[in-house]
């Protein structure tokens, strides 16, 4: 009987101890060194390619996420961080007012990118190239534990410093949108054909030439062309991402034997692709994309429909 009582007491103690650990505020132990709420955040370079600095993002909420792929706790929190990034990040959805800056302490960018190839993070990504103890970002923001997260308000002050992703989630759910600066540069401005969408449609109508062979065979296609618009608005790196052939009713191609039909369809698919690339390549310069007012190079996808 005594042994049974001892076992029950020990079991009860174990449950109680476990509950205390699970309910512990980890910020007390691990976030004490982070910049406290109300502190004006120091400036830092966010994107070297467009010389974007943290101070350029004033007027918007910003999340600094300090992490590394070698960190077990970071990997544990990554699914929730992905959800927050997808839900709130300004690059994911127009109208979102939070910019995520993911600062990695991996040894090199390749290692970080290998990990992120399986984890979708839409915001800015910085790789420090070494452990956080030896970095300027850790010194500036007081990072002594990862993952760490700092939510910055539109006035450039710390709204929350934490090592707990659940606290960040709650803070993002209750953002004070009245603090946003309506005059601040937009987080994302996509590239635009000069004159806008109507001008682009008119350009395509006037300049796309239907391939003669495809017309004779009664073939149509919807081609999706991807290309890069650089900071000068110039187009490069054209790629055909989709080329869906279809035939009109009683199309002449249907009268060909299977071998000829296959060869002709392949030939016409190439003609559609080449014409789509030709008309895109011949476009005048676009209005370049901007991120927080800075011109930036981005990829763009354009569908071109060939229909009889």
PLM regions: where:
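Charge-biased low-complexity segments
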Residues: 6, 151, 173-308
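N-proximal helix/coil linker or "cap" segments that precede and/or mark the start of modular domains
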Residues: 18-43, 55, 110, 114-117, ...
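Conserved redox-active cysteine motifs that mediate thiol-disulfide chemistry
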Residues: 59, 66-87
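A short beta-strand-turn-helix
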Residues: 42-62, 86
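Thiol-/selenol-based redox modules, centered on thioredoxin-like
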Residues: 22-25, 145-146, 151-185
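Bacterial Sec-dependent N-terminal signal peptides
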Residues: 1-24, 69, 175-182, 204
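Thiol-based oxidoreductase modules, predominantly thioredoxin-like and allied folds used
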Residues: 93-111, 121-132
């Amino acid at each position: 009987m005594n042994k049974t009582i001892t076992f029950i007491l020990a079991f009860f103690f174990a449950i109680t101890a476990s509950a205390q650990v699970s309910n512990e505020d980890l910020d007390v132990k691990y976030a004490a060194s982070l910049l406290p709420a109300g502190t004006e955040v120091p400036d830092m370079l966010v994107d070297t390619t467009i010389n974007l600095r943290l101070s350029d993002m004033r007027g918007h909420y910003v999340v600094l996420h300090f992490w590394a792929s070698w960190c077990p706790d970071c990997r544990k929190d990554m699914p929730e961080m992905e959800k927050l990034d997808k839900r709130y990040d300004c690059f994911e959805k127009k109208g979102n007012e939070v910019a995520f800056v993911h600062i990695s302490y991996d040894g090199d960018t390749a290692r970080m990118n290998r990990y992120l190839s399986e984890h979708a993070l839409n915001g800015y990504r910085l790789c420090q190239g070494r452990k956080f103890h030896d970095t300027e970002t850790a010194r500036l923001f007081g990072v002594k534990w990862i993952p760490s997260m700092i939510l910055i308000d539109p006035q450039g002050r710390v709204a929350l410093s934490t090592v707990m992703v659940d606290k960040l989630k709650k803070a993002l759910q209750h953002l004070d949108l009245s603090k946003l600066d309506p005059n601040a540069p937009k987080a994302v401005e996509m590239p635009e054909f000069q004159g806008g969408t109507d001008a682009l449609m008119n350009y395509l109508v006037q300049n796309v030439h239907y391939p003669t062979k495809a017309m004779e065979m009664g073939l149509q296609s919807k081609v999706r062309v991807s290309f890069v618009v650089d900071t000068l608005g110039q187009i490069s790196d054209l790629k055909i991402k989709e080329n869906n052939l279809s035939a009109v009713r009683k199309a002449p191609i249907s009268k060909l034997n299977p071998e000829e039909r296959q060869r002709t369809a392949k030939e016409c698919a190439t003609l559609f692709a080449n014409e789509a690339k030709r008309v895109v390549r011949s476009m005048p310069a676009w209005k370049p994309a901007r991120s927080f007012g800075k011109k930036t190079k981005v990829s763009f996808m354009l569908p071109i429909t060939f229909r009889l």
